[in-house]
């Protein structure tokens, strides 16, 4: 597997992770001695930080733990979000009865949730032209914590699941023709690097997601 390289120096590698490949698959394609500094879901594409040595890995992971990494995703969700943006703050933890999923817990609700905060901003709205059509909203999403499946669980909690999400999406969801996976892309990272600088990394939308948006605009 040939991974597209967004950035590389002596300590750090930023790759453009394709959808459909989990982190273990990515590891097998990395240079020997390199380690992903964080995770992206199998069907999520986008910028992935990779440390070339243990010292850099520790340096990067500490920033994630201290919530100092600025992360922005682009996602398409079901329905029309009328507001310009908002913040979702809940607890998120493992769902009882399904080890694959995370569940949103409210304050005082029995469970083992941990604090989770997600900010979102509307980029574009797609109104259905037919009476039985589906509205969609394109969002820029910034998770301020790093819980497993946080964006996906929070969007479903909001009532607007990520389009194409087979685990958190509503039953009988309408998916744009040709979209084969969830519309969730890690588009931006801002992080301090071991050389003392702060760097920003951008991953452009992949072709399958671009085609999906073009279809919605033209339909």
Segments and roles (model prediction):
Residues 1-219:
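RNA pseudouridine synthases
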């Amino acid at each position: 597997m040939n991974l597209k390289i967004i950035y590389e120096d002596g300590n750090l590698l930023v790759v453009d992770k394709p959808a459909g490949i989990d982190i273990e698959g990515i590891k097998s394609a990395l240079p020997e001695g390199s380690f992903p500094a964080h995770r992206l879901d199998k069907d999520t594409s986008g910028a992935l930080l990779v440390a070339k040595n243990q010292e850099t890995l520790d340096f990067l992971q500490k920033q994630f733990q201290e919530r100092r990494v600025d992360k922005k995703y682009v996602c398409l969700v079901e329905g029309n979000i009328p507001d310009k943006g908002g913040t979702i703050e809940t607890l998120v933890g493992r769902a009882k009865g399904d080890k694959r999923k995370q569940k949103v817990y409210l304050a005082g609700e029995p469970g083992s949730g941990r604090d989770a905060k997600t900010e979102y901003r509307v980029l574009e709205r797609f109104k259905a032209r037919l009476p039985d059509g589906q509205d969609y909203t394109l969002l820029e999403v910034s998770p301020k914590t790093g819980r497993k499946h946080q964006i996906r669980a929070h969007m479903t909690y909001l009532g607007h699941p990520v389009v194409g999400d087979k685990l958190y999406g509503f039953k009988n969801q309408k998916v744009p023709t040709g979209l084969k996976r969830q519309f969730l892309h890690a588009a931006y990272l801002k992080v301090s690097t071991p050389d003392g600088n702060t760097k920003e990394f951008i991953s452009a939308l992949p072709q399958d997601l671009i085609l999906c948006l073009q279809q919605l605009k033209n339909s």
